[in-house]
Curated annotation (Swiss-Prot):
Swiss-Prot/TrEMBL catalytic activity: adenosine + H2O + H(+) = inosine + NH4(+); 2'-deoxyadenosine + H2O + H(+) = 2'-deoxyinosine + NH4(+)
UniProt keyword NADP, yes or no: no
Keywords: Cell junction, Cell membrane, Cytoplasm, Cytoplasmic vesicle, Hydrolase, Lysosome, Membrane, Metal-binding, Nucleotide metabolism, Zinc
Organism: Xenopus laevis (African clawed frog)
Cell compartment(s), UniProt: Cell membrane; Cell junction; Cytoplasmic vesicle lumen; Cytoplasm
Residues reported in the UniProt entry to bind Zn(2+): H14, H16, H212, D294
Protein name: Adenosine deaminase
Source lineage: Eukaryota, Metazoa, Chordata, Craniata, Vertebrata
Annotated EC: 3.5.4.4
Length: 358
């Protein structure tokens, strides 16, 4: 296991597939498909796609333009990034991961507009999900960890959301466990009812729900996620603490916050001083939250970076890390029987199995 700050089994709930691709894989498919990259060595490519000092969220999102054309619209590439993702997480000591992505961003057919300036091809969002599932399942068998997926709606593309929820339903028993909403938080659901309708359908069909909210946006976005979209978890949620009443209500309801410390620094989502990070407040209040990488390719990170920040700047102890991972497992979108199995694995690894006297 790679992690040094917490060298025990971990659970990760907030990480993007398209932000977790190996640079070598990007270069391989760019060459194979004759797609021009900003550089053709790993070091050169990382200079363009990875960074270490805070940028705005918009500048961060522009990083994807450099490399996604090499991966999107290629069956082998889509399967491979899913497989290699599981390999990467296994090396980090993760035993259960929920990975999220927008099927439309990897497609080149039956998607409007076609992303990344691709020519029209024959890979639909539906086939993308099937390809990712194949890669994840193969990775699970090879690396002996459990991986599930979350399909993302994009705030600026409400016309995609009805298909996202249909794909969640179609693949509900085949790695897909939930729906997510990502993108520009200033685009609310009042103006873009496509998302609200998709989430209403999710509630009706028993599909789990998480929403990116309060990352750079105000607490009102979190409120909308909970009240309108019926979110069961909040992606990031840092700015929730600015509305004491909302924060108190979410604490009382045991709402789970998917916290990504290093990401929040590099996207300027939070104060650059980690001692002032909302996670320190969450920790103090014994809130329900997890620690996650978000986009490790772009942030040049592993899960150990986030755990190290929590130790060095926020004073987290090993017992608190155990609690964080147990909360992550409890808040995972696994069916109850699989959740119990996961929790048992953690309790066992953490030396927390109590003798029942049987």
């Amino acid at each position: 296991m790679e992690s040094k700050a917490f060298n025990k089994p971990k659970v990760e709930l907030h990480v993007h597939l398209d932000g977790s691709i190996k640079p070598e894989t990007i270069i391989h498919f760019a060459k194979k498909r004759q797609i021009k990259l900003p550089a053709d060595t790993v070091e050169g490519l990382l200079e363009h796609v990875s960074y270490k000092e805070p940028l705005s969220l918009t500048e961060f999102l522009q990083k994807f333009n450099h490399y996604m054309p090499a991966i999107a619209g290629d069956r082998e590439a889509i399967k491979r990034i899913a497989y290699e993702f599981v390999e990467m997480k296994a090396k980090e000591g993760v035993i259960y991961v929920e990975v999220r992505y927008s099927p439309h961003f990897l497609a080149n057919s039956k998607v409007d507009p076609i992303p990344w300036g691709q020519k029209e091809g024959d890979i639909t969002p539906d086939e993308v999900v099937d390809l990712v599932n194949q890669g994840l399942r193969k990775g699970e068998k090879t690396f002996n960890i459990k991986a599930r997926s979350i399909l993302c709606c994009m705030r600026h593309m409400p016309n995609w959301s009805s298909e996202v929820i249909e794909l969640c339903k179609k693949y509900q028993n085949d790695t897909v466990v939930a729906i997510d909403l990502a993108g520009d938080e200033s685009l609310n659901c009042e103006s873009y009812p496509g998302h609200r309708k998709a989430y209403e359908e999710a509630v009706k069909c028993g599909i789990h729900r998480t929403v990116h909210a309060g990352e750079v946006g105000p607490p009102s976005v979190v409120k909308e996620a909970v009240e309108v979209l019926k979110a069961e978890r909040i992606g990031h949620g840092y700015h929730t603490t600015e509305d004491p009443n909302l924060y108190k209500e979410l604490l009382e309801n045991n709402m789970h916050f998917e916290v990504c410390p290093w990401s929040s620094y590099l996207t300027s989502a939070c104060h650059p001083d980690f001692t002032k990070h909302p996670a320190t407040q969450f920790r103090k209040d014994k809130a329900n939250f997890s620690l996650n990488t978000d986009d490790p390719l772009i942030f040049g990170s592993t899960l150990d970076v986030d755990y190290s920040i929590a130790v060095q700047h926020m004073g987290f102890t090993e017992d608190e890390f155990k609690r964080v991972n147990i909360n992550a497992a409890k808040s995972s979108f696994l069916p109850d029987n699989e959740k119990k199995e996961l929790l048992y694995k953690l309790y066992e690894a953490y030396g927390m199995i109590l003798s029942t006297g049987l």
